[in-house]
Amino acid sequence: MRRIAHGRRSRLFVVVPLLVVFGGDANLPYLHVPIRSSGLRLAEGGQTGITHIVQAATSTARQGAYYLPNGYESRPLPLMVSFHGTGGKGSLMILRLQALAEREGFMVLAPDSVSVAGVWSVGQQPEDMTEDYRHVMDCVREVLRVPGVRIDAARVLAAGFSVGGNVAPYIATRESLFTAFAVLHGHVMPGALGRLRPRVWLSTGDRDRVRTVEYMRSVAGHLTAEGFPSVELRVFKVDHSLGDDELAALVAWWLGRH
């Protein structure tokens, strides 16, 4: 199935019947936010979840962060693993996503890339496994070991923005943990695809000149030809950036609430 839809600020409409967020080469500024590894209670806007820095570290001493919504111990929850854009960090992605995660009831893990420039490395061949890949999976295993954490195994999403978009299919087509991946204003390298075929979300902006609508349509066509059974393509009224509407639509699609 392949659908293409255009989004507005308040709603989406079909034109033709595949998270952070993801800070970096979008329009997110650098913020220096201290997050204690012991956990930070968030009181703003009634949020009471907990943010942690991951203990797993890359060879460049970069780590990442994760967010557990209020009451996470009480039931299995969906998990989003999100990948930042150029110049980004996981902690910035958590800041972008935590309110949505709290409201919709899912956990977010946002690893840092190995590169201090905030770019990601993906394999060029099916058997290639980069340090970024290993770090992401180390972070995932760390979160799954947290006391009280249980995942909803039917709803595990890998989502990446811009240059981080390529990491989502690279990992989600190799790791059976993931049931879907999302590429937001990003690209997909055909050689980086593994053998698994989870659900796919693709999105971009009608004014995005970095990842144009035409390019994302070509990605959707390629993935469909590669045997992905469900590819969702959405177009929003934005440039190369992420708005609340796009993130909310992604989560609704992922969690089956649209």
Task: Identify the meaning behind each predicted range.
Residues 49-68, 78-149:
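Serine-hydrolase catalytic machinery in alpha/beta-hydrolase-like enzymes
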Residues 78, 198-199:
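Alpha/beta-hydrolase fold active-site loops
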Residues 84-86, 144, 161-163, 168, ...:
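Cell-envelope and extracellular/periplasmic
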Residues 91-97, 184-193, 214, 218:
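Alpha-helical scaffolding within the catalytic cores
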Residues 154-196:
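Primarily recognizes the serine-hydrolase "nucleophile elbow" in alpha/beta-hydrolase
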Residues 201-203, 213-258:
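C-terminal catalytic histidine-bearing segment of alpha/beta-hydrolase fold enzymes
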